[in-house]
């Protein structure tokens, strides 16, 4: 399996459990590893034969930007489900974080791994 990756995709959204968080937008930053077979694309040199990371990024920017999740866990799970629905990937490892959410910490968040069969 090959990996197409996206690193430090940061998207503004409403996220959090506190009243003040429901009134503002905060950044969620994402690192993704998308498992797929890139052999066709490496032979053809055609974007349609691989996972288009720009299309994945655009999909996530729209979905997350318009969402209002309370928990980063829910945002992560639903984002991964959406990627499986729209793109030809068999595996996703996603790191979803909220920079500055905890005083004294650079960022907090979750890392999830899913295979297509368990999505």
Locate predicted features.
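N-terminal, polar/charged subdomain of small-to-medium soluble alpha/beta proteins
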Residues: 1-119
